[in-house]
Amino acid sequence: MKMEEMDLEEDVLDVVDQEASTIVDILCEQRDNVLQRIFALVDARTREQLQHLPNNRESISGLVDYFRTSDQHTCRRFLDIIWSFCENIPLELDIRIVNLAGSTAGALVNNSHVPDTENSPQSRYGKRARLDQVQSYTNAVKSFLQKKFEKVTKDIKKEVCLNNTWLCWRTQKYARVRDRPAKSQEGEEVSLEHKESVEALLMKTGRVVMLSGQAGSGKTLLMHCLAHHWAQGSYPSIELLFLLEFRQLNLISQPLSLKELLFRFFLPSDEDDEQSEAVLNYVLSNPEKICFIFDGYDEFGARFKDPKELECSVNPYQQLPLADLLSALCSAKILPGCTVLVTCRPRDVFDLFGSSDYFVAELLGFNQQRVKEYTQEYFQEKGCEIKERAVSLLMDSHHLLSMSHVPGLCHVCCVCLDHFLTSDMSQQPGTQLPTSLTQIYLHILSAFISRCHGCGSSDNHTPLLQRYRVQIAMLSKLAMDGLENSRIVFPANELTTELMNFGANAGILSRLDLTCGDGSRRLGCAFTHLTIQEFMAALHLMTNPDITESQLKKKLNLKSRWTAKTDPKTVFTDSLHLYMCGLAAEACTSNLVLLKGSENARAIVLKRQDAVLKTLQRFVVSGRQTGPKIIELCRCAHETQNIDLARAIGPRDRFELRNIRLNPVDIDALAFVISSANQMVCLDFGACYIEPECLNIIPNCKNLEELNFRSRKYDDKFAEALSGILPKLQSLKQLHFISGGLTNIGAAKLFKASECCPQITRLNVSDNYLTDESVKKITELFPKLAKLTSVILGKNNISINGIFILAGKMAAFPNIKEVYANAKKKEINVQFSANTTNSASTDDLNNTEESKQLILNDWNLKWTNVHNLCPMLRGCSSLTVLNLSHNALGNRGLKKLLEHLPTLDTIQEINVSDNGVDMDGVVLLSPLLCTLKDLTEVEASHNGKKMLVLTFSSSIIDALKQVTSEGCDILHKKLSLTHSDIHPTDMNKLCKNLIKCPNPLNLDFSHGTLKDESTEKLLKFLPNMASLNLLNLSHIQMSTDSALLLVQLLSDCQRTTTVELRQLGETFIKFLQDKSEAATCKFNQYRLSSANLAKLCEILEHCHHLTDLDLSSNFLKDEDVKTFVQFLPKLQISGSVSLNNNNLTEVGVLYLLSLMHTCERVAAVEVSLGKEEQQDIIGFVQKNCTGKTFRLSSCTVQSQNVLFLLNKLATLNSVQTLELRNNSFSADTIKYLITEFCGDCNHRTIRIMEPWIKGEAAVGLVQCCLELNPNIKEIRVEKTCLKLSVESLVSATIPNEWENGNCSLSAVHCISFDDCEVEGQHLSSLQSALRNCPSLQELHFSQLTMGADGAEFLSSVLPSLKNLKILSLSSKGETEDEAVIFALQHAQKHLEQLSLAHHVIKDRGAAVLGNALQGFTRMRSLSLLKCLDWTATGGRDLVRGLVQCHSLEEIRLDSIELDEESIDCFAQGLQAMTSLKKISLNKTISKEGSGVLCLLASLHPLIELEEIELIGLRMGDRGVEELVKHIPKWTRLRKINLSENRVSDHAGEMLVKALSHCRALQQIHLFRNNLGHSSAAVLGQVLPSLSELTELDLSENQMESKGCSSVCEALVSMKALKKLHLTSIGTSDLVNVASCLKHCTSIEDISLSWNNCENDVVLKLAEVLPQCSKLKRLDLEANNINTSGAMALATCLQFCPWIEVIRLWRNPIKKDDLILKDKRLNFSST
């Protein structure tokens, strides 16, 4: 409004009267000094009255009323002060005041308080002019915005109602999920929201708001509507509103200032630059009155800049890049306090940097009612019939309805329906509504073209798409060009006028007035919506001939809905891939062919459609997809309508969706995929925004088994909507509504709806806001859901009263098996037994009911609560566990609980741990343990304050009761009082009560403290405690004197059988019911003095039945040992004494050695002074004991004591066995020992181990020994150990040379060097000694390299060894020692055993060996192991000699090659070897593989056969058929090994049946064949008859589960079995095998490796292994055992000390847990 147009004589009083409310609002926001100036104009009396009103607003309102009735002069002064000093005066009021001041400028009172420059007429006239310019521009803006609104809404059918269009506010920013990889799918939850109408967006000013909405949600329309409402007078707090569109701003490339942005690109000033400057100054001076709306940030080509990268304050006149300028506006770097509204899509919200200075709102779509209303409005002019039909079609089509929740798509669906109904398509047979978004857009395209003006044609038979395919192709190319270059606006010069007119008339394009970067205007166009542009681009890709298949695939990729700052900015909706998928649908083929238009159009279209489908198939198999990409994949499949593709996506048991927005279209696509897959699935929604309309689509998901909702945003309203669909989910088994906003109201509706889901087994409503009322409601649900197994209610607001409601229902509903409530952990669970009908009836409840448990922890329960709880449980049959731990019962509560025990007749355990019970409570329980028949154990700790558990007998325990000879049941009882300080008075009370116990009793006082007085009290009662079995005092701080008092029990109490005392270690005393015949005493880890030791020995003197005494680890010194040695003859010990790990030196060793003289009953002394572990054991004479033994190891004797020790040993004539290990003895010392110790010619055995005894030194030592002592009978060197035995001449066989008086000859019978680094060159020194050994019968060389020197040695000594019968030569590796073979010619002809291993024998050597064998007429055993390198000729020469050895009883020819002629010769020779008992031909075969059958046929005469090994002969079924002819005759057969022979399942049956005749069998090895379940079935029948079988190996045969079951049946009776190997047998179901092992009482070695076994097998093993007391090794390599399974094994090992190793290689086990540190659990080969 201009000044010239204003009434200059406007009355001052009228202005105040008309603007009174506005003036009051202004004055309420002013400072006190301004109000004081105004109150100064009022008379004193009135001022006082006004200032005493109740509040400031009433005072100001009265003040304004005062001036409304004052005179003109006073009123003018009032307005003058307002204009001069008040802030935030609205523009129109400011203009009126200036006008009044200007009309009477000279009449104003001289205001000394106002500066002259401001109060001057010139200043007021200048301001009036500027305000006039601002008002003029404001009016122009309002007119401009109203015209734009009319243009935007010209085709809108329905009036836009801001008060009926809703948004929801987010109270915090969205979680940027992909910025945190560690939470890639869980993400943060978006916090609570609240709804508001869109008109509220501008009601509050001064804030930055991001309004997000999906493409097509109506953001642009609503922004124009808001601007229109402002222009009409709404939002009075906003003086100026600027609406800018990002699609226009995209055209700006150069930097610009705020002024240039407003007056070049929004609305240029109609007047000169002076007006622009005035408006800008007003904007800068009044930012709180300015509003900016930036529409379509998603269409902006750049990103907002982080405000941290901008300057603190940005100059509004400074030219900046557009993104920086807009970022400065949004972050208050420019115009702080102005209102900014930015519209965008949800993914773009993250681009607005900053803190809490901006708000996020989300535009909500249509609900079903709004969809219906819009559809009715759209078809209002079409007539009632079409309108009703359109509404009916839309509401009945869940595809169309799901799309219509987006307003833009709702409009699209209406256009589609309009075309469908008005073009008579609906009347054509077989015509259906489109079922995908792409198909709808194809209909839209046809609809747009059909209504295009000027497109008419006389050709009514040509389809529209074909008729205008050229124009469509050009528009499609334009769309694709824009898509590739991120352009949505096109200048008119980029397309022809005809094409623009066609597009605009059809509604595909919209014309635009574009403002260029220089401010000039020109015509342009854009597609009516981004989705239209993307659809047209997809048409281009599918129809343009220039597009290659490679280009097509590049455009097809899955989009994630999780966004990150690093994601590239795009202006499009990322729907191109969906339209491409939709166009690949079969239903779109004909339309694409029309648009293609070429001769081979169909072939090209089909090829491109196939390429799209194949690419999608690759996406399916490309690996694990995240939730957003799963949804996108489902959308793609839904668009294709391809069932096969949907089935490929569907096979997954769980669809996890986290932190994404889901709309009805998404759920519709998900339902399409899930319903196509033939399996049950789970839908898991975590913090996803789900529109209520989505829930109505979920019932379309067939096979839905589990439904999870997890987010605070899921509240009662959501639960109400969910309740509406639950009755439709008939296959639903699990419902989880957790971590939500559910209250009793929503829960009641949810529970009510759940009644209609008969399959529900699990209901989880934890972490909500439920109270006891909901508990009551959910218990009403229990009898109505017959299959319910679990209800979870934790983390709610449920009190103990609610818990008692659940506890009370345990009696009413028999199928409740557990109620668990832990207040500290906030867990409340109810478990139900399966397959039991829920019924409140309690009639005829029998013992078949499952046991029940009630667990109430950390509820601060007191004795009064127990008084209320127990009556509730009175009728609860089968209640076995009552756990009330971690409460506040105290002794009084415990007593109250015990009073109610008679009503709990099925109870097995009561846990009242951590309940404030003290020792008085424990004492209260002790008489009950004696008097209550069913109370079997009281387990308490820390004087009852921590653990306190009562255990009662049950049916299971009753079955294990011991039965006495009189037939009476004996129920064992136990009192555990651990970690307790038991005072003497308490000990006295306990023992007085327990002495009356009639049942066998165990007492456990471990880990506590016993003072001497308490120990004395205990000892006073122990002899009279007749029922006591065990007293456990482990880990108790006890004095040595108290410990000695306990030892006194061995003499004071004749029932004492074991006393084991360890300071702070395992300590216990065992008693028998009758007098003990034998007793053991262990007194360890005490620091015993000589006085203590003497006292102990004095006590033990009176124990006449002591068998073993262990004084290990008592810090005994040499002098203490001397004292003990003096006492030992007086002690009547019959077994052993252990002095391990004390502080002995070599002096102590001599004291112990003296026992051999002083105590005749001492049979053995073993001493080891090793650094790691000291061992000192004294053994006593047992029955059948001949001679004494002395063992000494790791004792480095000083040089002056060596001779003394050796002489001492030499005098011990009774010592027969002497073992000396690692004592640093030299060769001279050993020689001296051999001379002196063995000089008396008594029978002696000496073993000496020193690290230097090897190689040449070993040979030299043997030579010296033979020369020093001719009585040596046997001498061996094995590694570094020398072993020799000496016999007297009387017992030795006297050779002829001795009879002839040659006493220098040795009587040695056996010399052996085994793996001791001896080589042939070392043996020369032995020659002379061997020539003097005429009695030598055995000569062994193992693991050595003979060489030429060794061959020479053999050639030299063999002729002199007249009595040699056994010669063994095992080479170290495969070495060529042919000279050794030649040396064999010198051996005596009466040689009986010859063993050659790893020798390389060529033809000449084979011939020599063959000739030699012909002369060995007494040969009984021949072994040629891996002796290779002869040709066929050499092999024949060898075999010809071998077959002449008719007396052979054993042949081993492993891994040698024979040709067919040699095998034939060998086979013929075998028939003559009727004495043969053992034959091993492992992997011995001709290169051609023939001759096996001939060889097997030759075995028929060998009826004495005991062992046969034929590994790797590849005999196959024909070989087995031949073999089974002979096996029944081998009745003495003990071992058979036919591994690696390609035996089939059928042949295996024959073999096993034949073996049934061999009842002496001890070993069967059949690994790596082709046996199956048929062989196993026969084996299961035969094995029980083989009672002596010790080894069975069936590894690497595909026996599978059925065959395994057959073997299991036999295992039950195999008591002698020691070794069982079932490696890789084709089944993981080995639970039955594990279960049967308990029957194999002799088992030592088990292998179940490489079977992919699960934890169930391990758990069964853990249960069985404690019964396998001889097991040493268990192999479980390469299975599927996880950490929990390994922990079960580790726990089991604590009870199985006999097990040496369990191999767990190649299993998915994390070895972090301490329990897995047991060294016997082997996880790797290192």
From Swiss-Prot:
**Transmembrane regions listed in the UniProt entry:** none
Coiled coil spans: none
Which residues pair up as cystines?
none
Which SUPFAM superfamilies does UniProt cross-reference here? P-loop containing nucleoside triphosphate hydrolases (SSF52540), RNI-like (SSF52047)
GO terms in the biological process aspect are:
innate immune response; positive regulation of MHC class I biosynthetic process; positive regulation of MHC class II biosynthetic process; positive regulation of transcription by RNA polymerase II
Query: Which InterPro entries does the entry link to?
Result: Leu-rich_rpt, Leu-rich_rpt_Cys-con_subtyp, LRR_dom_sf, NACHT_NTPase, NLRP_HD2, P-loop_NTPase
**Top-level taxon in the UniProt lineage:** Eukaryota
Look up keyword Nucleotide-binding and say if it applies.
yes
Give me the LRR repeat coordinates as residue ranges. 879-902, 904-925, 1002-1025, 1026-1048, 1103-1126, 1128-1155, 1212-1235, 1351-1374, 1387-1411, 1421-1443, 1447-1468, 1502-1525, 1532-1553, 1560-1580, 1588-1609, 1616-1637, 1642-1662, 1670-1691
Q: What is its main location?
A: cytoplasm
Protein role:
Probable regulator of the NF-kappa-B and type I interferon signaling pathways. May also regulate the type II interferon signaling pathway. Plays a role in homeostatic control of innate immunity and in antiviral defense mechanisms.
Q: Family, per the entry?
A: Belongs to the NLRP family.
Protein name as it appears in the record: Protein NLRC5
Provide the gene name from the record: nlrc5
